[in-house]
Amino acid sequence: MLLWLAQYFQDELGPLRVFNFITFRAVFATLTALVIGLVTGPAVIRMLTRLKVGQAVRTDGPQTHLIKSGTPTMGGVLILVSIGISTLLWTDLSNRFIWVVLIVTLGFGAVGWVDDYRKVVYKDPKGMASREKYMWQSIIGLFAAIYLAFSVSAPSNSQFLDLFIAWVQSGFSMDLPPKADLIVPFFKTISYPLGVWGFIALTYFVIVGTSNAVNLTDGLDGLAIMPTVMVGTALGLFAYLTGSANYSKYLFIPHIPGAGELIIFCGAMAGAGLAFLWFNAHPAQVFMGDVGALALGGALGTIAVIVRQEVVLFIMGGIFVVETLSVMLQVAYFKYTKMRTGIGKRILLMAPLHHHFEQKGWKETQVVVRFWIITMMLVLFGLSTLKLR
């Protein structure tokens, strides 16, 4: 919105031309979201406390967590409000990628809000039924996947529609341009054509999978939010480079016109995340809840698809991946052993993985900081794929 105003008055006020620089707006989007979060955070926490939206803690979990019972949850609302206001203020509102990321973020946030509401009202840690949750996530994820399959390949909305019509007229068998291929990191000439159906399937699993992975990771004070900030910031850099014709050509990455504007959203997400961490650091004054975790994960997945860095997201978000795999393996092994022997056995002391380390004697803060360090290393490794080709 501010960009439009600046462009309208820039002939009379020359210094307003600085708003045309994406990097300038990204910095101030970060600061704006940070300030909004820090200023409104105490009021939001007081409101959540007054509404008695306290977190119901698992009784079969680490005993040290029982003291957290009653801590306000649904703090992800603070993150989403900060991101939304900052993004709308500083971004180019005509950019189609900004809107699809916002819609996915708010859509997954709405699913998480309903889940949190049921947990709070019914005092049930399980919240929304898994089948119902996945249904709504799938609807949003498929919407984004179908749109991005053609939007990533088209420089404008009008060409997006032409591409979609051509696909329908081809009997749903048309291939997509090379820029929609799956990129293999470290190899500048190797990529895999996905086709429309392959692109839709991959995008769906990346968005929905990342959303749930971040949600599973959000089990300790500050554990999920800092890796989200680090991965989101790195994706912002990828977005900036992908949106630049010169940088993308030099680095042998696809040039996606308009993708650079996503650095504004990533900056806002980083600022909002740091503001939330101020209140979520141990001992947490507020929890993110599903409303925040599902939304942030969905945003990360969507941005990674747009900038064609799905594999790099898998690398940088390694903590999210391992946490998810720990749950899947734990459940699968328990069911398998129960079917074979009648007694279910576990691979880990407790899943997700962060609880396993707690049960082994690690303090909560040790688990959190060590996972942060691992994420920082993985993010740097992911960024190295830009040049090591």
UniProtKB/Swiss-Prot annotation:
Please classify the protein's predominant subcellular localization into one broad category: membrane
Summarizing the function annotation, the protein's role is: Catalyzes the initial step of the lipid cycle reactions in the biosynthesis of the cell wall peptidoglycan: transfers peptidoglycan precursor phospho-MurNAc-pentapeptide from UDP-MurNAc-pentapeptide onto the lipid carrier undecaprenyl phosphate, yielding undecaprenyl-pyrophosphoryl-MurNAc-pentapeptide, known as lipid I.
- Catalytic activity annotation: UDP-N-acetyl-alpha-D-muramoyl-L-alanyl-gamma-D-glutamyl-meso-2,6-diaminopimeloyl-D-alanyl-D-alanine + di-trans,octa-cis-undecaprenyl phosphate = di-trans,octa-cis-undecaprenyl diphospho-N-acetyl-alpha-D-muramoyl-L-alanyl-D-glutamyl-meso-2,6-diaminopimeloyl-D-alanyl-D-alanine + UMP
The family classification in the record reads: Belongs to the glycosyltransferase 4 family. MraY subfamily.
User: Where is the protein situated, by its record's location annotation?
Assistant: Cell inner membrane
One GO molecular-function annotation for this sequence?
metal ion binding
Return the broad EC class: transferase
Segments spanning the bilayer are: 21-41, 70-90, 97-117, 134-154, 189-209, 222-242, 259-279, 286-306, 311-331, 366-386
Any one GO CC term of this protein is: plasma membrane
Any one biological process term the GO annotation gives: peptidoglycan biosynthetic process
> Which EC number(s) does UniProt give?
2.7.8.13
Q: What is this protein called?
A: Phospho-N-acetylmuramoyl-pentapeptide-transferase
Coiled-coil residue spans: none
Matching Pfam families: Glycos_transf_4, MraY_sig1
Membrane topology, as annotated: Multi-pass membrane protein
Q: Which cofactor does it need?
A: Mg(2+)
Query: Which InterPro entries does this UniProt record tie to the protein?
Result: Glycosyl_transferase_4 (IPR000715), PNAcMuramoyl-5peptid_Trfase (IPR003524), PNAcMuramoyl-5peptid_Trfase_CS (IPR018480)
Alphabetized UniProt keyword annotations: Cell cycle, Cell division, Cell inner membrane, Cell membrane, Cell shape, Cell wall biogenesis/degradation, Magnesium, Membrane, Metal-binding, Peptidoglycan synthesis, Transferase, Transmembrane, Transmembrane helix
Pathway involvement of the protein, from the record: Cell wall biogenesis; peptidoglycan biosynthesis
